[in-house]
Amino acid sequence: MKIIPSIVTFLFLIAAGTVSSPAQNATTVEPLLVYKALQDKDCRHWVDSVMDKLSFKEKVGQLFIYTIAPVNTKRNLELLREVIDTYKVGGLLFSGGKMQNQVELTNRAQRQAKVPLMITFDGEWGLAMRLRGMPVFPRNMVLGCIRDNRLLYEYGREVARQCRQIGVQVNFAPVADVNINPENPVINTRSFGEDPIQVADKVIAYASGLESGGVLSVCKHFPGHGDTDVDSHKALPVLPFTRERLDSVELYPFKEAIRAGLGGMMVGHLQVPVIEPIGGLPSSLSRNVVYDLLTDELAFKGLIFTDALAMKGVAGNGNVSLQALKAGNDMVLSPRNLKEEIPAVLEAIEKGELTREDIESKCRKVLTYKYVLGLKKKSYVQLSGLEQRINSPQTRDLVRRLNLAAITVLNNKNHILPLHTDKEQTIALLEVGDPGETDALAKQLSRYTSLARFSLRANQTEEENQRLRDSLSTYKRIIVAVSEQRLAPYQPFFAKFVPESPAIYLFFTPGKMMLQIQRAVAHASAVVLGHSYSSDVQRQVADVLFAKASADGQLSASLGELFPTGAGVTITPKTPLHFVPEEYGLSSAHLKRIDSIALDGIRQGAYPGCQVVVLKNGHIMFDKAFGTYTGKGSPRVESTNIYDLASLSKTTGTLLAIMKLYDKGRFNLTDKISDHLPFLQRTDKKDITIQEILYHQSGLPSWIPFYQEAIDKDSYDGRLFSARKDVHH
């Protein structure tokens, strides 16, 4: 079913406006994918007709999603036939492998099934997460650095297109966990970051793109897997937090996803004592979590999936599929043993532990989603040309644009960036890692400046390290390009690398790699995070250094004590050039004293705020804003503020002329002005010194309202105004 994006957006706005405050039970927001279907007679008729044809055991089977390997062995084909013909499962999840094998098995399975199967996929960063030879998109932690969420929406649309191409209707993505624990062994870069608001925005943008492309999004891992140090694949993590903490961090993205009308939710294997007091009971099996919190309190009406029930985080809880359905889940994912677990559900109904109405309601919901996702009739994937359709030029361009939009300038001390193009001045490029990996960077840099390339090899001797440091010290600017992720062999060099010249670090690696050389990075004049060493990213970073391209990324997760979440300096082609003071005979140390002078003036009440700009030979040496507009509580002064300047003739005319003459030694500041202007010797100005003139303290009014002269026509003999231009007007 194709959903027009504008309609989805409109419905999102309606849905978002119907939710009450978090302190109250949320008003119901129907998921957008089924919003229209619930009023669609054809949908209800199809669901009713299928329900009438299914036995009760088959209705139970519709609630199970079986995981199978995409291989065409005899044993695997027999297993596929068994789970479809005997257990009548409602869906399949293929583990990793070849795309062609998965598609062939999907077509075979759909032909065998009595009711079209819901084909699911675990593709957090696209099909490449599970299938070889597919387009590789950036990880979520990288995408979290992108400011423009429209790109995330476009990304979701593209992943949906690819899923539909291979016969997939459900993607178990996005990860809505807030990764505020850097030691998290399982979520980490799968998360969009550590700011709950930013994570929520990214989740909604990506998931809305998926669903507008006709694929069900599934936010995971409810109620939040971000602040754990245990992998739920191996054991049961515990979230020992208060409810207030859960509401503000872990639950926040999920609540916003519900408000946005997204259709799927996966419950993780997590122990949350403040919600579920039974020790060792995972959220996926807890009615307090699934039904009371997710379905009732948060009013989620979409499809609820368990995380994979084969994981060790849920082991030791008896028949976990039965427990999951009793807790309120709609579909159980990856059951261990269908032969035991489906009969256990039927037996529980006979005992009154579950009602037939529960199963009927869940089955009806599953069928409604199948209808909406285009499964009202069987369809098959066309294998011919499939790989070319997925790996399209448009897809490659989107991957490129996502990577470029994530480039983040983490800091820019003394406005060292952008650099100015100057073929007469050579910049040193130190390449850390295989020099061939940063050839694209070096080639692009050479377009703007003369370049001297140096290579830092792993495990150099201290003598070799010192020779390299000495060589680099002869350059006025140094660019350090890091493409190597294991920096331990390079630490001895960086431990003593504190150059006097500005050093600009470029990381074509995950951001956390810079923590291995933290001291050197802290000393850097600028740090740019490129995330990957693709040629496109390298060329873009080179362009950003010279303001030939834009960069406006913001850090999605803090990097130790180096950079906080949200760090990011915007560089655009309009960013003014700044220059190194020493190259023009000035001292950076002296310029730093400007800060204390400007702040002292604010403390003494001379002015509420100011901007100080130092130029030399037309180049900006210093540009910094201090204080506020009018005092405490008013907006801060920014370098982009526009000023109404008055009395400029003194500073831009007379003062500059005097400064020039003084530099040439033509007078001393203690000279009397009449010594240089003889006509003043017979006036009361004869004893005034040049220094006193520069104080500008005559006591005259600060300005004269000349415009008032135009009000009184008698003040001027003649016509003040004319309807046309002439020699007088």
Describe every region a protein language model picked out.
Residues 1-29:
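Bacterial Sec-dependent N-terminal signal peptides
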Residues 23-83, 296, 317-587:
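Preference for extracellular/luminal or secreted protein segments
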Residues 55, 92, 102-117, 127-129, ...:
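Second-shell residues forming the walls of enzyme active-site clefts
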Residues 71-85, 152-162, 247-254, 316-323:
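Short, acidic/polar
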Residues 81-97, 182-183, 258-281, 473-485:
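Short acidic, glycine-rich surface-loop motifs adjacent to enzyme active sites
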Residues 99-116, 147-167, 354, 359-364, ...:
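Active-site-adjacent structural elements in enzyme catalytic domains
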Residues 583-645, 666-668:
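Short, conserved catalytic-motif segment at the N-terminal edge
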Residues 616, 628-729:
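Active-site-proximal loop and beta-strand segments within enzyme catalytic domains
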